[in-house]
Amino acid sequence: RYPDRTSSLIMGGAVMKLNLRGQILMRLGVLLKSVLPYLVLYRFFALIIMPKKSHSEARNLFVREAKKLYQKEFKKWFTLASEINPLLSLFRLRDSQIPTLYIMGEEDHMFLPSITKLVQNHIESTLHVIPNCGYVVNVEQPNIFNEVSIKFINDRKSNN
């Protein structure tokens, strides 16, 4: 709506499209959210999104933060998240032409493929993939995440 208010974006572990597996999981979650305790669902989804042993710190953080939500809030969030694909398609189709850096983990099997495709079609977008890293890049590799982010910000400053 107001593109002049944003000079650049940095998106770590961006979600721009739920792949088929993600869509099925979200629909399954919507069906089960009234039957299963919400923390069971959250732990399950955290394990699906971040399956490797090296992702355990990020997975534990994910679950720890979920505990701060009340079940009613979680159900609202879950319903919202399951309906987000149509809205995200607008962002994928329409190039904002705002310089955007996507920082993704090499082991992010759920969201990296769609970001890779998106960056090919958006002129001002770049992708930095962090090796040996999953979905929550700023937790698993904070030093690399910060270095790449600071470089992007400094490059924008020198271009202005």
Regions of interest found by a model, annotated:
Residues 14, 105-106, 132:
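Cofactor-binding loop segments of dinucleotide-utilizing enzymes, especially the Rossmann-like FAD-
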Residues 20-22, 38-94:
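Conserved alpha/beta-hydrolase catalytic His-Asp/Glu region
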Residues 123-160:
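Catalytic active-site module of serine/aspartate enzymes centered on a nucleophile-bearing elbow/loop
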